[in-house]
């Protein structure tokens, strides 16, 4: 479907910063290279974001040890039939932390700046939430190794959650995540 659709000029990829971030969002102006070639970062959008929210660049080093952005790139490189740029963003906050007014303000400030910057750019933009779904096993806090049952139950929950995204129901999506306590 993506190959047949009108394709955007820019892909804003928001991925998970597993080690956490002090400022909740980390943007980088570095290009990314995969075995399929170089994916350039959209410098004009990144520089505008930097002007509006300077601290978003403070932890760009976090990109060095993360994989959330890179996982999306080979898919885009093989599916998008025209040149494109990206805006790589790492984020680190939980749905439950949004009850903290300071966290909520920081998130709203960054997302407003991002939305305004995308609009002002005049470019067509696609936002990719490069979030990871369920993690199973002892290393993720489970009391036992995963079984076929736990795997399928987890997959059902992930699909339930994604149904709200597919149906463009952000309030239901947020409520689901809070109910599941970001698990």
Give each language-model segment a name.
Residues 1-183:
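Active-site histidine-anchored catalytic micro-motif
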